[in-house]
């Protein structure tokens, strides 16, 4: 008999996760997620080969290059792509906000964004969403099940 995994990203022991509505997506759907483990996890990643990449790609490449991480924080509704230095600063700040809330170093936080291109992240909404997600981290992971399939795949891939 095949057992269906209803736990999602927290199926592995030691992982917690939460998805929240921060008001970034116009639809009002869940748009910020945090996945966290207290134990530093081995990480690997594949990234776009395009000459133009979103700011979170550059930040996350730096984290993945270290080989370990504690968390992933991602948002939907704003891709933080084609946003120049402000986008890079925002991606680093996104990692720092999550790190501060989780009690880890910012270079242990992978970041991801998906959504509208050419728009800066609404950092006030994102910061509130990250704090809300961290406050609601759970080992059941059920809050992430309700995130749209493409976003969920982006968050865990």
Which functions belong to the PLM regions below?
Residues 1-48:
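N-terminal amphipathic/basic leader segments beginning at the initiator methionine
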Residues 28-31, 52-54, 66-71, 104-108, ...:
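Short coil/turn connectors at secondary-structure junctions
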Residues 35-68:
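Active-site-flanking structural segment that lines cofactor/substrate pockets
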Residues 35-36, 73-75, 111-113:
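Short beta-strand segments
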Residues 73-102:
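Alpha-helical support elements that line or immediately flank enzyme active sites
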Residues 81, 96-102, 111-127:
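Hydrophobic alpha-helical hairpins/lids featuring a short glycine-rich hinge
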Residues 121-144:
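Glycine-rich and small/hydrophobic secondary-structure elements
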Residues 145-157:
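Single conserved hydrophobic/aromatic residue that forms the stacking wall/gate
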């Amino acid at each position: 008999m095949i057992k269906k995994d209803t736990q999602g990203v927290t199926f592995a022991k030691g992982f917690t996760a939460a998805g929240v509505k921060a008001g970034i997506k116009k639809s009002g759907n869940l748009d910020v997620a945090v996945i966290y483990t207290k134990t530093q996890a081995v990480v690997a990643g594949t990234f776009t080969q395009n000459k133009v990449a979103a700011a979170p790609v550059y930040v996350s490449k730096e984290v993945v290059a270290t080989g370990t991480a504690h968390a992933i924080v991602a948002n939907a509704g704003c891709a933080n792509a084609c946003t120049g230095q402000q986008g890079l600063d925002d991606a680093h700040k996104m990692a720092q906000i999550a790190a501060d809330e989780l009690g880890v170093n910012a270079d242990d936080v992978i970041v991801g964004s998906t959504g509208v291109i050419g728009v800066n992240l609404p950092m006030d909404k994102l910061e509130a969403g990250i704090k809300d997600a961290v406050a609601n981290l759970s080992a059941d992971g059920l809050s992430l099940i309700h995130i749209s399939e493409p976003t969920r795949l982006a968050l865990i891939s």
